[in-house]
Every structure is written in C-alpha cells, then in structure tokens.
Amino acid sequence: MEMLYNDSKERQVRSVSNLGLNNLMKETYSALSSVFGEKLDEVWLYGSYARGDFDAESDIDIMALVDLPKEQLAMYRRKVSDLSSDLDLKYDVLLSIKLQDKDTFLRFSNTLPFFQNVMKEGKRVVQ
C-alpha cells in the first residue's frame, strides 16, 4: 500500500507499494547484472521491506552477493552507488545496496548475526 503524507516542510515522503517494490527490485537486479555479469550470484532484499514492517522513513536494504574477491569489490562501489542514486531518484526512495563477496558470506552465514538475519528474514530476488 502506498503511503503519502506531508511533513512540516510540506515535502512529500512516501514508501513503495508492492507493485513499485517489485518493479524496483527487477530494475535493481537488472542494473546489478549489467555491472557484474555472471559474477552476480544472488540479490537479497532484507530489513524492514523484507519483513513488511516498513514505514515512510524506511530505506530499502539490498545485499548483492558477488563471486569476486572482496578486494575487487571496491572497484565497483562507485558504479553501484551511481546506479543506486539513479534508482533513488526514479522511485523516490532510499536504496541501501551492500556489496558482499560470496565466499565471506558463505563462510560466515552461520556465525555472524548480520548474515544470519539476512538469511532468516531476507527475500531472495529472482530475475
């Protein structure tokens, strides 16, 4: 359900409807695929949007698991930040895209609380 309201500065703030979220996730997946190609392993939606308890101030948390060494991921951060900004403006939301190397995620997914939370509450995005 799309929620609209005006704050004290008469600035419109909104959250994304289910249809808008699906479109945003498809477009995010496609954009990440264009950056990483076959090295993009999985994309996960996690946090309040995955749990369904988001509000108008919530950001949209996304984790991209990439089959590259973590040292190489640094080269892609600017490009991913730019695509995130483009999608922020298009959908009038705040995306928070975390790049994560697949090896570290797999190695620590049973021990690190953050990774456990992504696995427990997250939703895997499929193209």
Provide a role label for each language-model segment.
Residues 1-39, 51-56, 67-127:
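Catalytic core of pol beta-like nucleotidyltransferases
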Residues 41-49:
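Short gly/ser-rich loop at a beta-strand->alpha-helix junction or flexible surface loop bordering the NTP-binding
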